[in-house]
Regions:
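Metal-cofactor-binding active-site regions of metalloenzymes
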Residues: 1-190, 199-204, 209-211, 215-216
Length: 218
């Protein structure tokens, strides 16, 4: 037995992956052509995504996300990704989802989650892998936008959406600004997580723990 095969046989869990971020350049190009979305400047000469720092990465992420326009697009994305990691031995995944990015493409929260849930179900039927979703607000969109995501998740519960979090540019907004959103999510029974310590120091981690009452840091 080769080491590669042996590694694939070990059961694994993927606990931190942003669903739009798993899209391959080929898929993004295909959907951009299909939906007539301008993605100029998104790719480097050799075909990969073009970014050199975290701010450019976030901009590239936003651009690539715009090509997903229908629930079927998201079902395809979720199914393709989950099937791929199942081949590597994954039996469980938690997908970070961004209702703000879906809304920017004209999708309602219900259609967005419904499309992803369909893809999850298809992947599970094919491979046995299970998945759940963590809905995140984007901190550089502002506290009001993050609260809107928390409100959507709380008032439109879905059995596969089990968590709420905070993502985006860590330099935009102190965690205290988002405490209300996290209280709303906690009252709805959701698990809480936040990105902290990526581009800021240890004080960002401390603030996330103090003001957001998270049980996990990403």
């Amino acid at each position: 037995m080769t080491q590669t095969l042996a590694a694939a046989l070990v059961p694994k869990a993927e606990l931190h992956v942003h669903i739009e971020g798993v899209a391959s350049p080929d898929l993004v190009r295909e959907l951009a052509d299909q939906h007539g979305v301008d993605v100029s400047g998104l790719f480097a000469e050799h075909g990969s995504y073009a970014w050199t720092d975290f701010a450019q990465f976030l901009a590239a992420y936003d651009t690539a996300s715009r090509v997903f326009r229908t629930p079927q697009d998201y079902a395809r994305l979720a199914e393709t990704y989950l099937r791929s990691i199942a081949l590597d031995g994954a039996i469980y995944a938690e997908l970070t989802i961004s209702p703000d990015h879906a809304a920017a493409s004209g999708l309602s929260y219900a259609d967005y989650v419904g499309g992803l849930a369909e893809g999850i179900a298809r992947a599970q039927a094919a491979t046995g892998i299970e998945a759940r979703m963590i809905a995140v607000g984007v901190r550089h969109f502002g506290a009001r936008a993050v609260e809107q995501v928390a409100r959507q998740v709380a008032t439109q519960p879905h059995p596969l959406v089990t968590g709420f979090g905070l993502a985006g540019d860590e330099t935009e907004g102190h965690p205290a600004n988002f405490a209300r959103a996290f209280r709303m999510a906690a009252e709805a029974g959701l698990g809480l997580t936040a990105h902290a310590g990526e581009t800021a120091g240890a004080e960002s981690v401390t603030a996330a723990l103090d003001f957001l009452q998270v049980s996990r840091l990403g």
